[in-house]
Amino acid sequence: MQRGGAPLSAGAMAPRPLPEWAPHEAVWIGFPSDPNLWLGDLDEAEREVAAFAEAVHAGGAGEKVRLVAANDGAGAKARKLAPFAEVVVEPFGDIWLRDTGPIVLGSGEGRLAQGFGFNGWGGKYELEGDQDIGERLAAAAKLPFSKSDWVLEGGAIDGDGSGTIVTTEQCLLNPNRNTLTREQVEARLLEDLGFERVVWLGAGLLNDHTDGHVDNLARFVAPGRVAIPAPTSDDPNAAVYRDAAQRLREARLDIVTLPSPGRVLGEDGDVIPASYMNFYIGNAAVVVPQYGVPNDGAAVDVVEALFPGRVAIGLRADHILTGGGSFHCISQQVPA
């Protein structure tokens, strides 16, 4: 494997996940289902999720949307708000299917749903149903399923389809996930997901309870080309962004920048991990989270320029973010 650049030699290698911009058959999207978790944000979070689903579906020009609800009541609400979607009722803890759902490898008849251990982001939020929702979604989609014996969340990695991924040391080397060395993590990424080159970034965003998921920090937009945020003048993550840029340059990857939302505060006055990098790349549209700050529109414009042939759509995600993530975090694509 290549670390920061060096390919691992390897024996048996898994089929790789396709890059997110490859054609999708469908997408699983988690639908907020537990009033005890979402409290006063539930209704607005439901509406934000439904708007995201509609943008991805694009009137049938996009991809099939499978809204995953944890109970019959939430399923009924999902059908009302998103009548274009298939609603799948399967018990789960919360909506973060990027991390709890399966990663679908390969394409066509050769697809395999690959699952991993999940421990609530290092024991922070261990909720019933999150540990096996991936296997149940794979079964409902009639996809063969395999599960690895180590903890890995989908939001912790981002690949370019050619065998290279970016990730963060803060998450993948965190002892609250696994007791694995860097070399052991790299070997497992090769064996289970076919990734030959791991580019290690340092820390993720401030106050990110996932311990620095890379899908809030750096995203591939083409083979060998990575988008990262450019800090604002008072950006709480300025040092993180500078460090990421330096490591990506050292790895000889092509870097493009998006604006950063800057300093976005929650109701308690604390910095929240708002990021435009948590966009979702659908068949017809790239959906970019918006936070009601000055750089919202500029971020959408940059994303649209990066994906010719797709429209970029900015949608508010304030209430989803109160749960800890945004559009990429609640979705998991199924390649065609």
What spans do the regions from the language model cover?
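The feature marks the mature, well-folded catalytic cores of soluble enzymes
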Residues: 5-336
